[in-house]
Amino acid sequence: MAWVVDTCLLIDLAIDDPKFFPASARLLDGKQADGLAVCPVSVVELAPVFAGQLTAVEEFLERLNISWPEVWTLADTQAAFAAWDKYIARKRQGSVAKRPIADVLIGAFAMRFQGLLTRNSSDFRQLFPSLPILEP
């Protein structure tokens, strides 16, 4: 079963980030045999990196051998619904993530895969405690 690649790792590779590229590339290379997938939300988040050119995003994902498009399912919606409810409860207590809705949707999507590859594990762990998460 494939691992879902978070947007941050894709950006590291797309912009050849001097700080994060090497570790992000090693992590993706190490999980290539399991398969790699991307959430539709991450594809949307990549738009500014590729000047709004969806074909450029698709070519980039193809070069990385990352499965796209993946379908958003009812199970994804149910997981996102529950996680958003948790997020709002945390917000009312004063502890919130930076980009809550994107992280909720990406984490929910990753629940039906092997896990999530990200360098922002703290953004996901409280909302998705059973989600396997690997960092570079």
Please report, for each region that a protein language model flagged, where it lies by residue:
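Short, well-structured N-terminal submotif of metal-dependent ribonuclease cores
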Residues: 1-38, 48-61
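Active-site neighborhoods of divalent-metal-dependent phosphate/nucleic-acid chemistry enzymes
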Residues: 69-115
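Short active-site oxyanion
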Residues: 1, 32-36, 46, 65-68, ...
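Conserved glycosyltransferase catalytic-site signature
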Residues: 7, 40-43, 100-104, 121
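Acidic, PIN/NYN-like endoribonuclease modules and their adjacent C-terminal/linker elements
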Residues: 2, 107-136
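Nucleotide phosphate-binding site architecture
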Residues: 10-11, 44-47, 125, 134
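Short, hinge-like loop/turn segments at secondary-structure boundaries
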Residues: 54-57, 87-88, 133-136
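Generic detector of contiguous secondary-structure segments
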Residues: 56-76
